[in-house]
Amino acid sequence: MLKNDLFLRALKRQPCSRTPIWVMRQAGRYLPEYRAIREKTDFLTLCKTPELAMEVTIQPVELMGVDAAIIFSDILVVNEAMGMDVEIIETKGIKLTPPIRSQADINRLIIPEVQDKLGYVLDAIRLTKKVLDNRVPLIGFSGAAWTLFTYAVEGGGSKNYAFAKKMMYREPKMAHMLLSKISAVISEYVCAQVEAGADAIQIFDSWASALSEDDYREFALPYIKENVQAVKAKYPDVPVIVFSKDCNTILSEIADTGCDAVGLGWGIDIKKARTILGDRVCLQGNMDPTVLYGTPEKIKAEAAKVLRQFGQHTAQSGHVFNLGHGILPDVDPANLKLLVEFVKEESAKYH
């Protein structure tokens, strides 16, 4: 039995004594303890060494007091497992070779045996669950098909997604073939993470806002739905969070994927999101990450505002406090600790 199951209760919209909190990228460069480990190893080796991945996954639980851990990994492990060469230099960027731009390139990508090619993530989950010893739930995750598609076609990050969109608009069938191939791997991968012990899954569509509403409906949402339903078919009680960054105009359709929670960027008032969605899903978010550069008073004021805007809980509501995107690497860890403690204290009155 979990000693602290608030995060899972909120996702399932069950009564909670307060609002649970975790933050995206909570295991990362803002923590000196993380940097000490990173000094001795490169990023992908850290992801691929279960003992180290476990250690950095648990750091924010012990140091910051967050209500959930998220397994330390990277969304691009899926691209690598499919046969792409992935180079991640934390300060300089990402390079994937060769970029996928033709039918022959797509054919060359493999549908990997997840237990084999991504076994190190599953081992890290098993080890982390053991060491966490039921203190808090563990989140598994994957990038969404559209986001992984953009990295594959662009060969890295991009400002305007020209190659990805060129394929979408000139060769839509080819684009769907690649998206479908990536999505099949994601579905298998997230189910394997649950099997290994993950208590919840988050799908990150980091580059969602690059698409128009109609294009998002065609090239992104169907695959997210496929991934959510894959988990639900096998593990109906495992909550799934969908974080389609800044897709504030189609929140209702994101909720229609069957997910348990919708992650929000900071560009929308959480009150407005709750008005749109009612209490049919849990909401996760959505403080601007740069608020953590502020004074203690400002951090508390902004956190209080998010809690106030979400408002009073009902028997069907759920809210997980988070940032609207990942914590920034140069934030003072003391500021996150302050935020976590404040949310724990301040949120009780809304429950």
UniProtKB/Swiss-Prot annotation:
Entry-linked PROSITE patterns: UROD_1, UROD_2
Subcellular location: Cytoplasm
Alphabetical keyword list: Cytoplasm, Decarboxylase, Lyase, Porphyrin biosynthesis
Enzyme class: lyase
Site (Transition state stabilizer): 74
Pathway where it operates: Porphyrin-containing compound metabolism; protoporphyrin-IX biosynthesis; coproporphyrinogen-III from 5-aminolevulinate: step 4/4
GO molecular function, one term: uroporphyrinogen decarboxylase activity
InterPro entries attached to this UniProt entry: UROD/MetE-like_sf, Uroporphyrinogen_deCO2ase_HemE, Uroporphyrinogen_deCOase
Family, per entry: Belongs to the uroporphyrinogen decarboxylase family.
Function: Catalyzes the decarboxylation of four acetate groups of uroporphyrinogen-III to yield coproporphyrinogen-III.
Subunit structure: Homodimer.
Stated name of the protein: Uroporphyrinogen decarboxylase
Species this chain originates from: Chlorobium luteolum (strain DSM 273 / BCRC 81028 / 2530) (Pelodictyon luteolum)
